[in-house]
Amino acid sequence: MGSEMCIRDRYKIFTTEFDEVAKAESLDTAEEIQKLRKNLDQQLTSFQDLITKLANKLQRQLMAKQNRSWEFDLEEGLLDSSKLPRIIIDPYNSLSFKKEKDLDFKDTIVTLLIDNSGSMRGRPITIAAICADILSRTLERCSVKVEILGFTTKNWKGGKSRQEWNRLGKTKNPGRLNDLRHIIYKGADSHWRQSKKNLGLMLKEGLLKENIDGEAITWAFNRLKKRKEERKILMVISDGAPVDDSTLSVNSGDFLEKNLKKIVKFIENKSEVEILAIGIGHDVSRYYKKAIKISDVQELGDVMIDQLSGLFENKKLH
């Protein structure tokens, strides 16, 4: 899993040999994925009113911005009837025209990166999956591309990376010591209808393990960087600090945290990608300049929609 953004400066990785980037559909049988999606759909029914409300709210706001986006006092374009009274008062005033602006938000991609760690099990991951579902459906209707990614590890207790480390004599401070699993639930160019079944996989028993956030953000960032869209937004949904027991047991206690801070700082200060985070039950503002904490996972949908509609005011995050 080569990384275009340099993350190796003082951040060691023992081995990348056992890491994987997996399409969600490759992680279980088609039958099981269908079953998990049905399970998600059953949970969706209790949120149906909320979903419809949120989806309509975001769509209304996007479409309103689309309709409101005009340039005034132009030499040519559509006649601006609101300025006609001044010509009646003084015929020497020239006619004023208006023109609709290009719709900036259409040239936008949003990547949703979801923490697939064990502490998200149960209600948090269900709500995250539901929100990802709502978001991709709604933004797709408004011609905004959406990518949905997840991150975890393949194993507890370090997996094959740790076995290899043991075999080679347990070198001191080996760096990250577990097998990464990065999951593509929905690629930016695939339609929601094609990918919706994959979102149920987040509910799969045994999928959610450790979370190594810095490398996951690097991966999502590098995918975004390759996109042709002018505006790129990375939204991280997480429930706190990066944790991997295998790595932290043989490195400094802040090893993963330091890397996360460094990666986020780089993206915030030195890249065109706009990054924001939603912390579920935890304040993540110590890692991200633009961060929101929600206490109850039920708030997630509302917060996501509010944040996104704020972003589409055609203002960059600062």
Feature locations, PLM:
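Acidic, glycine-rich A-domain
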Residues: M1-E4, R8-H318
